[in-house]
């Protein structure tokens, strides 16, 4: 028997993701293209048996989970909600750099934004839970939170997620190489 995998699914496209606006807690719906991306995950996920499906409570992740065929077993997990961008919510990187020269989400938190220490604190209990899984788990969530989750999974600090580009409607896989936690596939 092979070791369990944790499949990460980023939600499909939204108007804000398409327009490169930072979308944290604002509950923006999927576009038609986003719904198509989510539905395209269904045959890929149907090849596997998942013991659990976890999803962010935000509508774009829940709808992606539903269209991908796992909505009937989805567990809403608040720790999977996207980062709270504070004053950066709804803004583009270019707009933020006008205000904060050299700004990146990974290096320059904006006022009232969630810190990476806070993000790590909410993800660590979930990671401990996933380390004990005895079957494949599907997780439906958001770009930055999934990138941070993957970085923490392989022992990097949260900001290590800056090295892991993740497009909408894509799958990634976390797992083990013997006893070592690894990224088995990314952004496929």
List each language-model region with its residue ranges.
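GST superfamily/GST-like fold recognition
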Residues: 143-147, 177
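Loop-to-helix element that buttresses phosphate recognition and phosphoryl-transfer chemistry
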Residues: 6-64, 111-124
């Amino acid at each position: 028997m092979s070791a369990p995998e944790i499949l990460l699914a980023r939600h499909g496209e939204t108007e804000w993701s398409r327009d490169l606006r930072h979308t944290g807690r604002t509950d923006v719906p999927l576009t038609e293209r986003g719904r198509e991306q989510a539905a395209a995950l269904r045959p890929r996920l149907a090849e596997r048996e998942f013991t659990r499906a976890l999803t962010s409570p935000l509508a774009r992740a829940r709808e992606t989970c539903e269209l991908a065929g796992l909505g009937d077993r989805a567990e809403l997990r608040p720790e999977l909600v996207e980062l709270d961008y504070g004053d950066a919510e709804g803004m583009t990187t270019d707009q933020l750099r006008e205000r904060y020269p050299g700004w990146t989400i990974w290096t320059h938190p904006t006022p009232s934004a969630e810190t990476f220490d806070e993000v790590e604190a909410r993800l660590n209990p979930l990671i401990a839970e996933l380390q004990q899984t005895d079957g494949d788990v599907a997780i439906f969530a958001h770009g930055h939170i999934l990138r941070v989750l993957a970085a923490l999974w392989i022992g990097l600090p949260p900001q290590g997620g800056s090295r892991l580009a993740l497009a909408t409607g894509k799958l990634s896989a976390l797992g083990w190489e013997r006893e070592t936690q690894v990224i088995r596939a990314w952004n496929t």
